[in-house]
UniProtKB/Swiss-Prot annotation:
Protein name in UniProt: Uncharacterized protein K421R
Keywords recorded for this protein, A-Z: Late protein, Virion
Cellular location(s): Virion
Gene Ontology cellular-component annotations: virion component
Phylogenetic placement of the source organism: Viruses, Varidnaviria, Bamfordvirae, Nucleocytoviricota, Pokkesviricetes
Induction: Expressed in the late phase of the viral replicative cycle.
Similarity field: Belongs to the asfivirus K421R family.
Length: 422
């Protein structure tokens, strides 16, 4: 006689019971952390933001602070005082990078990662669009990164083989976050404004510039240009080309300027920062075509991002009537469509310009991309190193380099205050 035993069901029930007991044990610690985040208006990021947005339990809190050194020490002291004779006796604050990154461990477990809000020129903090989510634990409205920034974080990791072990979980997060994100905006194709007649008039000149931009193996095509020219989707006002380069962005400026000058093409070039808090090193080179000396007759034709200068970017090769060139994988394309959406939202907040219809246009492009039939797994996750373009920087080596440059700060133990600790 054999008896059927639901081994999987028993294991899942046992695991759920263990997790709940573990969570109950540290409930005061978790509640104190959330109350601190709420009181000091910190901004939750990373996987913590995904879980908060999806109303799931959080066990490791990652958040930005506008006063990270003082806040980290204050929170560590609060946690220690919860139960200094037992559970929180071994509370320690570890300085990873002074004034930038701190970790708090309680009972030999990591509970908190605090980051400084990335700075831009003159050390001004990057403006972050406020977004609120209700906590499943305390029912408080907590600041967190908006869904577009969370998706940018997810796509960045899905393009990075260093996070391959996290890909199954990230794909689940991506699906849920994308659904929630798209529910917030109506899907429309219309786009206001633009200079379509001028673009059509100078189409041959613009095409000459674009073909020169995509001819090198050091650049990757992303964005609406792919939708229009490769998938035969009819898009209005989408002569703009979006690229990723593996070269230094200022080198690219000189190369492009030299090409256009030698061919008698009048352009204007500008380099700026899209102000992504998740990616402060990102820069964008923008090219405007100008057939006259009138600035009102200038219009944007190329956006070039410097992502390939500091990280690897997965690519696919496409053959067209105009030749073959590299394009980003679907996750790379999605990432930079969301960058466009973020920039437009920031412009709307800072200048009060009405960018609603343009945002809806890019959201429609994003939805079209994600609803298209998925290519092979190799096209999504290239396994050959030849399919990756850019410069690899070991994140651990980068952290060690930063730590060596700065003064080493010993751990801070709230139970044993030390003036030299932080």
């Amino acid at each position: 006689m054999y008896t059927h035993v639901d081994v999987v069901g028993i294991a899942e029930a046992s695991a759920a019971l263990y997790v709940q007991k573990d969570r109950d044990r540290y409930s005061d610690v978790l509640t104190t952390i959330e109350n601190f985040i709420y009181q000091h208006k910190c901004i939750i990021t990373g996987e913590s933001a995904h879980l908060l947005f999806l109303k799931k339990n959080i066990y490791l809190y990652e958040f930005y602070s506008n006063n990270v050194a003082e806040h980290s020490k204050a929170l560590a002291t609060l946690l220690y005082k919860l139960d200094p004779e037992y559970l929180t006796r071994y509370t320690v604050l570890i300085t990873k990078i002074p004034n930038h990154w701190y970790v708090i461990n309680v009972d030999q477990r990591e509970f908190v990662r605090l980051y400084a809000i990335p700075a831009v020129k003159q050390h001004l903090p990057i403006p972050i669009l406020p977004f609120y989510c209700t906590s499943a634990l305390t029912q408080q409205e907590l600041f967190c990164l908006g869904p577009e920034l969370q998706l940018i974080q997810i796509y960045s990791k899905l393009c990075n083989p260093n996070f391959v072990e996290e890909w199954p979980t990230l794909l689940d997060y991506e699906k849920s976050m994308r659904t929630l994100f798209l529910e917030q905006f109506p899907q429309r194709l219309e786009m206001t404004g633009g200079k379509k007649e001028e673009e059509e008039k100078h189409e041959s000149i613009i095409k000459k510039i674009i073909l020169e931009m995509v001819s090198t193996r050091q650049r990757i095509v992303v964005g609406g240009y792919i939708q229009k020219n490769l998938y035969n989707h009819v898009l209005k006002n989408r002569n703009r080309l979006q690229l990723i380069t593996s070269l230094n962005i200022y080198e690219e400026k000189d190369i492009i300027q030299q090409f256009c000058d030698s061919n008698g093409l009048k352009i204007k070039i500008r380099i700026n920062n899209p102000l992504l808090p998740t990616n402060p090193e990102l820069r964008r080179l923008t090219i405007y075509f100008n057939n006259t000396n009138d600035d009102d007759q200038s219009y944007l034709i190329v956006d070039m991002y410097n992502t390939g200068s500091y990280e690897l970017v997965p690519t696919n090769q496409i053959n067209t009537l105009d030749g073959s060139f590299l394009i980003g994988t679907p996750f790379v394309q999605a990432r930079f469509l969301l960058v466009e959406i973020w920039v437009l939202m920031l412009i709307a907040q800072q200048t009060k310009k009405d960018t609603k219809k343009i945002i809806q246009f890019f959201i429609n492009q994003y939805e079209m991309l994600m609803n298209s039939p998925w290519p092979s797994m190799e096209a999504l996750f290239p396994s050959s190193s030849k399919r990756y373009l850019g410069n690899y920087v070991d994140p651990n080596a980068l952290i060690k380099w930063a730590q060596l440059k700065l003064k080493r700060i010993p751990p801070f133990y709230p139970g044993k205050p030390d003036e030299e600790s932080c």
